[in-house]
């Protein structure tokens, strides 16, 4: 099976937030995402949103008790842990780290140069989702 050709990433993380409007604002301010699309239901809750970063994207929406939502736990429901982490490649990791820290990101793995190349750090957003940002580009051929 081959992926459908497209202009962006073929793998797009999807997250749920209790307050998706606040999450969108914070993710744009702290991490530099831009709104690609935000769709609300009849009560003004975020049904589906797309936030872009470079040629990548995350999708998000409000926590819901539907067939899909019943398979997703929020970090605070499972002791602050995650089973997955969104990894984002950034051009200037040090300045991205400083921006995220200034916006209140909870740093869980401090900024550091990595032995395998590049630099990176990990943090939690206000609802506890784990993120990794780094300058290492896994698509680049290995130097050797």
Predicted regions and their residues:
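Short, surface-exposed ligand-recognition loops at beta-strand->loop->(often short) alpha-helix junctions
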Residues: 16-19
